[in-house]
Regions:
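A conserved mid-domain beta-alpha-beta active-site/ligand-binding segment of alpha/beta enzyme cores
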Residues: 223-241, 245
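Active-site and glycan-interaction determinants of carbohydrate-active enzymes
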Residues: 244-259
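Proline/glycine-enriched tight loop/beta-turn segments at coil->beta junctions
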Residues: 54-60
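A domain-start/cap signature at the N-terminus of enzymes
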Residues: 25-52
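Short, aromatic- and cysteine-enriched interfacial helices/patches
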Residues: 3, 301-309
């Protein structure tokens, strides 16, 4: 008997979970932990509560975090990449590790922990770094989007920080309200904006969701090869570097990140420049999904002939 689409999605998710758990490495912390990048010694990540930072107002903070069962060290690497682009006297760059709690068979359980617990812990640890930060940029993939959304809500209540959320293919479990992601109360003295980079894979619309409180951009068509739920966390760091990292699975592939003259990804952040951020604030949220596409190659009826001769 042929399998129904819902059954295929369930099987695909289960196989992903089994594979990821089997090959997971780099032991996570026993409890969710915030790390920040430090220059000395040895250019490394240190637990935020062990860093000798003065508790100060006016800091800019950017934090990346993962989603359900992820082996890749992309949040840590992204924090280092951004740190290399900004003034370290003005920015704190780091990543939030809750992998121990994300290593569960059901992604719904990971999203539940992210929403109910991890977000609060992330907010608490950020506010230990700065009582009243100037600007907060939180970046997350999949289930982790619930953690940064909840953290942002707490930070918005307790500070006057400008808040930027970057959702990488947010996962919204069946029955959950997608409109609660990034639903930050609007106040005259606060600035909030979010971008959401989404795609589809073999699970169909499991993560393909337009968010009401984010600027929605479909990057599926610019994926090198098959569309992949994990592609956004390979793509976004590449927009920081201007190319895919030499150690990335997409190393050497062409990077696309424009819609017309507008650049997406890292270019939409304050880290990329004040003018970039101010331009982002003019982009609508809850928009019809914008689709990035590879530029069409000019038609060359004899191109195949010369290509064959060169081979």
């Amino acid at each position: 008997m042929p399998l129904k689409p819902n059954n295929l999605c369930s099987i695909a998710l289960l196989l992903t979970a089994i594979t990821a758990i089997a090959f997971a490495s780099d032991k996570p912390q026993d409890k969710p932990t915030l790390y920040v990048a430090v220059n000395e010694p040895n250019n490394r990540m240190v637990k935020a509560d062990e860093v000798n930072l003065p508790l100060t107002d006016g800091l800019n903070i950017v934090i990346a975090t993962h989603g359900w069962i992820e082996r890749e060290q992309w949040p840590k690497n992204l924090a280092f990449d951004i740190r290399d682009k900004v003034d370290s006297n003005e920015w704190v760059c780091g990543w939030f590790d809750w992998r121990n709690e994300a290593r569960v068979v059901n992604p719904r359980d990971a999203a539940h922990f992210a929403r109910e617990t991890a977000g609060k812990m992330l907010a608490e640890q950020i506010l230990k770094i700065s009582n009243n930060p100037r600007h907060i940029h939180l970046i997350a993939h999949s289930s982790g989007c619930w953690a940064i959304s909840e953290a942002a809500k707490i930070i918005a209540q307790k500070t006057n920080a400008n808040i930027h959320l970057t959702f990488l293919d947010a996962y919204v479990p069946l029955g959950w309200d997608a409109n609660s992601l990034g639903d930050i109360p609007a106040e005259p003295n606060k600035i909030y904006w979010a971008d959401h980079y989404l795609t589809q894979d073999i699970t169909g619309n499991v993560t393909y969701c337009r968010l009401a409180h984010a600027h929605n951009v479909d990057i599926g068509e610019i994926t090198p090869g098959l569309k992949d739920h994990r592609f956004p966390f390979h793509w976004y760091p590449a927009t920081v570097l201007g190319k895919y990292d030499p150690n990335d699975k997409y190393a050497g592939e062409k990077l696309y990140y424009k819609s017309g003259n507008l650049k997406y990804g890292f270019a939409r952040s304050l880290e990329a420049g004040k003018a970039n951020w101010e331009a982002s604030l003019k982009l609508p949220t809850g928009n019809n999904i914008i689709k990035l596409a590879k530029p069409k190659e000019p038609f060359d009826p004899f191109g195949w002939l010369f290509k064959n001769k060169s081979n």
